[in-house]
């Protein structure tokens, strides 16, 4: 599907002719991303990322293009790939390629191409990456497994199509550039991780004592998880379902699996669209929150009998099984808004009849003739069937990413090989950079008031343990 359009150009995109279209949308997005634009103004002259060679793996969207160009404006060199085979916006990738930035991303790329492109973003010729910006942990795992294998650790036996292509691509890279990933890992100053799933991977690696460089958990910055995960999903989920199916949500019964920040936003999105919403949960605290918000909390076994629309938002695997889908009502809509495609047992449906209605929307027919609708083949529905979160909320997330990259690159000696979150004063800074755009006016504490509650007049205003 994808090919390098000119051997002299260091990119793979669907159509470089889309660059002007992409550039026009990037200009619009910049007006909705005040945090990133403020960082360009603040740090453009000092170039804090000069010398940084960032391997980036994150959805190649218009909003990500603004992030990439902010990193470059602050002095970094960047090589970029998407972190999901369906999430690329081809005009965004074309605009980045036309700007001379190496990018490897095509909407609908195969799993083989996906992992080959991960290899491409680590190939810096005679140099190596010295920073990683990741979403989901795939780039980090590629580098770490490469170094482990070269150190003599056996590579795991793949158990699914994704792992088969990962192992193949990694072996081919190691054969082509022996010792290179070991050298890369040694030079990497740190990784900033965007999403819940990738953060879980990092904490597990750190727990096992195998994290070779510091990591910043961007996901758990308040201005990421409580905004991108919550308010972003609140707008983008229903947008995706409507684009994919043209279904009327009002009056439908929907089930959201998981009531974390993403699940909360998803449930609110469906309720806002007029659906009656049920929630499934394993955690008694989240279940109680859902109940107090007025959602009916049920098991999936009950939900499949009653619901018309199903959304997984857990970060787990096998949340909706083949047996669940067999029990659903005809023409039920099934989709996922968690990072990976493990939440719905898509592979268990492979032997059934699939009919593509349009890209991202498939009818799956069971042996008894019943059909259900699968969106984005179980991958991220808001990016597979629509354009993801709005620019403004992504500005908040990506401002955290840029600050994390600056922090790790310029203050590397202050960090151990552990997983950190950004300090509270930077979290508050990210929020502050987005207030003017919304016409927000902050109240100023008097010295007496600040002393009374034990904070500085300039902040931080909350202790680290405060739950927003």
From Swiss-Prot:
One example of a Gene Ontology biological process annotation: S-adenosylmethionine cycle
Functional pathway: Amino-acid biosynthesis; L-homocysteine biosynthesis; L-homocysteine from S-adenosyl-L-homocysteine: step 1/1
EC number from the UniProt entry: 3.13.2.1
Statement: the UniProt record of this protein carries the keyword NAD: yes
GO cellular component: cytosol
InterPro entries: Adenosylhomocyst_ase-like_sf, Adenosylhomocysteinase-like, Ado_hCys_hydrolase_NAD-bd, NAD(P)-bd_dom_sf, S-Ado-L-homoCys_hydrolase_CS
One of the Pfam families matching this protein, by short name: AdoHcyase
Residues reported in the UniProt entry to bind NAD(+): 195-197, 229, 258-263, 281, 316, 337-339, 382
Binding site for substrate: 61, 135, 194, 224, 228
Cofactor note: Binds 1 NAD(+) per subunit.
Catalysed reaction, written as an equation: S-adenosyl-L-homocysteine + H2O = L-homocysteine + adenosine
Molecular function terms from GO: adenosylhomocysteinase activity
Sorted UniProt keywords: Cytoplasm, Hydrolase, NAD, One-carbon metabolism
HAMAP family: AdoHcyase
Entry's family note: Belongs to the adenosylhomocysteinase family.
Functional note: May play a key role in the regulation of the intracellular concentration of adenosylhomocysteine.
Name assigned to this protein: Adenosylhomocysteinase
Gene from which the chain derives: ahcY
